[in-house]
Amino acid sequence: MGAVLDRNSRFFVGIQMRRLCIMEYDFAIIYFGLTRSVRMTYESHKQRVFDVMKAANLSYKTFMHTWKTKDGTQNIWEKVIPQKIDYEEYKLLSPDFYALDDEDEFLESVNMDNYFYKDVWATIGHSKSGEWLPKLISNYICMLESQKRGFHMVRDCVMKGDKFKFVMFIRPDITIHNDLPVAAITANPDMVHIPNHSHYEGINDQFTVLNYEQACIHGRRIDELAEFRKHNGRIVAEKYCKFIITKYGMKMNEIDLQYTITRP
């Protein structure tokens, strides 16, 4: 007959077993937004990100948040395209954690008047002193919310005891052309790592690596978007990314990561 544990002993063993389940990882990799073209991009992610990390003995967990739309409809810029969303192709990236939410349901909860000023659009239109295209604004809000929900998946793991040194935000629809420069990232844990291209009106926001504390800000920046629009003119993705990085005094490290967005 095995040993019988008293109440205090059972409590101690339970704590020890929970500690055994706690893991420390180098990276949390968050995929966000519509998957769109994963069947054409996933091999580059495997070769240029996952294999590179494994070769460098870096540990990671992958998280994906994406949306479902009415009838699987998707668009490029403001144009609806005939290709429907394939809700199974995400499996090619093998995320450890996956969430699919209703985009239309989310948008119904958003007051677009806080982000897109119709009077400015009517008088000035699409320009730096006017507004961004209305469909791009709604797309961007969905992207930011997807980042937030993806980050909350990571946060849930942290609340259960897991730890992550870095958090990577990455679009699933990019084809990556060179190896992720992991040495440049891990050698600078207090910097925000951004590709050295596609900054436009601010800072590239399609791929970002930050430490966990910085990711708590960056991953939830949608919460400050309406206030930004009040005081800083029209919303543009790169412009707002630069605003947040500057506001919170984050130092940027431009890394050599070349990629192209792959359309369906």
Where do the PLM segments sit?
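Short, Lys/Arg-enriched N-terminal segments with co-localized hydrophobic residues
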Residues: 10-22
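ER/Golgi luminal nucleotide-sugar-dependent glycosyltransferases, focusing on the catalytic module
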Residues: 23-264
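Intrinsic-disorder-associated, low-complexity terminal segments enriched in Asp/Asn/His/Tyr and depleted
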Residues: 6-8
